[in-house]
Each structure stands twice: as C-alpha cells, then as structure tokens.
C-alpha cells in the first residue's frame, strides 16, 4: 500500500530488542575476520556494547567520511558494507520478529508523509518525495469517505472511526509539505479542500478554535472539547495555527487571516497561564510576529 503501520513491539521471545541486537560472538561467527574488523571500525563495536552488553548497529559517520578516515576507496567500502549488511540481514530474517500493529492511522501517516517531504526538499532526494507522494495519494483514496470527510484509521483494508482534529491537522500539514517540494498545484488544491472540510466539521463558528471531534459526529457526544496542550504529539489546534498561516502564504486566501486572528485570540488566556504546555502553539504565534520560525 505504501502506507505506514502504527507500531511494533519492542520485544520478541520475551527479550527486549532481541530481534535488533547483536552479540560479539554472534558477529564473529557470521562474518570473516576482515569483515568483522571493518564492521567494528564503522559501527564502533566493543565488548561493552551499547544495549545491555550487546550492540544495536549504528553507523558512526557517513561512509564517505569513514572511507577517508580508514584510507579506503569509497566505492570499495560501500560494496564491503553492503555485503556485510546483506549477510546480517539474512541471518536476522530467521529470528522471531516483534509483533506488528498493522493499523494505519491518518494522523501518524500525515506526520510520516510530512517528514519524508521535508527530507526530500532539504536533501534534494527524489526517492523521498515519491514515497511521500504515494503515501499521501493512498491515504486520500483509502481514508476519505464518500462525503469527503476522513476516517481516522483502517485495518486490513477496512476503514473505521471518524477522524479527529489531529488527523486533519497532520494530513493537511503533509499536503502543504508536499506542495513545497515541487510547487505541484495538485497538493495545494488537496490541502485547500481539506481545509474547507476541517473548517466545516471542527471549527467553532461562535467562539473560534477547533473542537477535537467533528460537530456532526455519529453516536453520543456529551462534551466536545478544544485541546491546546502538546503531549506525545502536537495538539490539533497548534498544528492548525501553523497550517492556516502556511495556506495563507501559499494561496493568498484572505479569509484565512480572520481565522488565524481568532485562533490566537481564543487560546491566548490559556497559553499565557500555562505556556510550557503549548510550545508549538507559541511557535505559531512567534511566526506571526517574526516570520517563519520552523527552522529555529
């Protein structure tokens, strides 16, 4: 599908990290002495290890720098490391893999798409852009209902649960990030369409701000709150403040100015009272005053 699953267990066979870690005896058994020595130099493997006496393989520098340091031809080093990794990968494939949670969550896929799009733009990597673009198209196809609203998640191809504000906010940010790579109008049009949807379903038309759940949610909804605090992920209202500014800069839609102003006003007292709980919202406010601060 080209989308991202939600989670993987850390342990397998009752041991945390077992699938991913390596012991020195194991590496010595699998590799020739020269290959093992080269692996140790490139990945800084020692007796102490870096995870409970064993090692999570972590390349210490880019291969070009390592080739210079070791006095080796760059192409030769790349080939050697590729062969070593293929050997270790084949052996690891025989291990019991951690359980994979195959739910596809709109919010989290939006975050991954945005990350790949940003990397594509900054690193000039076409392959990263293709990954992001394909995932975005898949999400829009699989997680968009007939009425245009979003589903929050899917499992085994079956979509369910009406999207939350965070799903819209992160996917909208992803579409904007994709537009920024090549200025393809398709992504900006998709972003503007999603913006219209989130304004219709989540925007408090009386007091401003975005509700966590759609106002037309099916099923009982006794209280519909507005959340501004960042937790493990960014709050939907903070993300939307950034999105509104980004859309204004790219589309010139003047109505966005009013939404931005009201979004800041409605949460000003809450953020002033407890600023440390809403750093991303404050970053958005700073961007209004000082310009884009995303790279700070």
Segments and roles (model prediction):
Residues 1-296:
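Glycan-recognition and catalytic cores of secretory/periplasmic carbohydrate-active enzymes
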